Amino acid sequence: MKQFKRLMILSFAINAFLISAPTHTYASSTDVIKSEKTATRLNYIDTETIPYNKSFNDTKVGGLSGISYDAKSKKWLMISDDRSEENPARFYEAQIHYNKHKFNKVKFTRMHYLTQANGTKYPNKASYNPHSQDVVVDPESIRIDPLNRNHILYTSEGDRNLGFNPFIRIASRTGTLINDLQINNPIKKDDQNKYEFRNNQALEGSTFSENGKYIWTSMEAPLLQDDQLPTTESGALTRLTKYNRQGDVITEKAYSLDPIPKKPGKNKDAENGIAEILTLNQKQLLVLERATVQDKNSNFKNYIRVYKVDIASGTDIKNIKSLQKSHVAPVKKQLIANLNEQDIGHIDNIEGMSFGPKLPNGNDSLVFISDNNFNQKQQTNLTAFEIKP
């Protein structure tokens, strides 16, 4: 209970900071190039591997779990899910060039630390003071704000053990906190440990709506009160949530996760969940499902599928706290790519997804990024595809 009293004090302090902060003007939706794209399949272009020992601006490059492209500046942003263990929580700017055949250039150009309301960097678990207003962050997704390209959105998965809820924050392009969305739907932790998000399986994906007015997020795994985790025999229901910019839930849909595609070795691990989402158009999202299966020798294999989802379909569940005893219809989904069925070589722990520049033939491109977990046995890969409309 002390943790939750501290959270309330922390929330009050952040709100006080934000109220006293200068206001920011946004472009009108008519000034924004609406994201209206179509997709029927993905054609592989190329993969570029970032070396494990890559460093930049005295930080270790790794754990890259989110990626976002700014078509106006032609810059790419990549966020690390480092919980300030290797270096303080941060994101990178980069130049990434590719054509319809191959990657030509990947160059890191800037690094920015993410900061808290008091202007300090996020602490790690070891240095965190539970009597302070500090937060231990677990960054996952990053998006450039289409209504103000000097701003970014990023998500954190929270930490049940420390009493931190998942959050959605708006920051400057240099990492300074601007706004903290006061999300109030049932993803938040209760004080009896019976409900809400699972540790390290919470706000994994985010995307702005096609007009930039709204924010969609995805839960990697079902809430505790919604469903069991997927197995090799059955899938599970998780949530896609649409917020306005004040953090109010506009609509929420159930998403049916696939069963785990392969049986793990005896007493080994396996999971499947949503790794990222991306707005395709007014009616559809792309959803990236990632399954990880450990074999008998403790080796992990990743299974990556990309679905096109009809967000107008399915039951609106925003007022349903638990899905277990509710008869709800999930959104309709259509497979457009199974990366394991394409000849793309090694598939690592893909967590991020972003549209890139248009290709010379006018088709859109899509880039995935994998999170190496700061593990020398894993790879940080950028993988590019052509989107066939």
Where does each model-flagged region fall?
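Sequence/structural signature of beta-propeller domains
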Residues: 22-389
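Sec-dependent N-terminal signal peptides of Gram-positive bacterial secreted proteins and lipoproteins
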Residues: 1-29
